């Protein structure tokens, strides 16, 4: 799902955002349903880089306030949580309501310093080949009223982290040595990150390829907020908003299975986890196939490692009281 703006190498460095700066405010109580008197700067119209608005999105109050502080007071905000808690979506949905342009870069996607900063490219000028510097996404974002979101921050390569560390300084200037240029950030440039671990390395070994975020890196983030899995009733509201015809009892049971998978994931028993998105898919498939067990296998079970399927089938059996072909009983039958 990790959307990546980095993959398009032919990035247009001359592109502008629709509006040069926020020109209005948004009332936090009215827009986000959080009981606080606060007007946050916003743009009156969206840009092509403003994320699409999900009307049914449910905001976690603490995380929302942290992200809003990032936008309103130029704080560097990091959102942490397990896989499937919707960290980047949360930042994007806040941005969507502020019409703030947003650029997401997944650091796990083997991004190099050159991708981020830019490269020399050979171009044709009046029929002659000349070398010119092509700006990467980072210099462009810095010079515009854009929220830059680094996803999978804990998986970034050292050369990339070194560049980001410079930008994290409070003045956040970026020096392009090859270019003899210093880029000062736009007054409305914002920086966010999402990370899968608490930066302390991961004791359960769940996230392969994540580095320990060093203390110097962590200290530069002004706000670090933890996003946990949703309370069951919130998740029910989200899934039924997308599947209004579902039987509430079946939905509640689906979420119980999802919770067992999350417990198992946190304990290190399984390596795949059911996110709210998985539950939505399961409910949609159930509407098509009219069979809870079969649609569970299609939506989640078949995505799990073969060794783990028996345990996952057991989660299902515990809640629905039905043995799936993958369960121990099913195997021996």
Q: For each predicted feature, which ranges?
A:
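AAA+ P-loop NTPase catalytic core and its hallmark functional loops
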Residues: 4-249
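Alpha-helical lid/collar subdomain of P-loop NTPases
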Residues: 4-47, 64, 229-236, 241-333
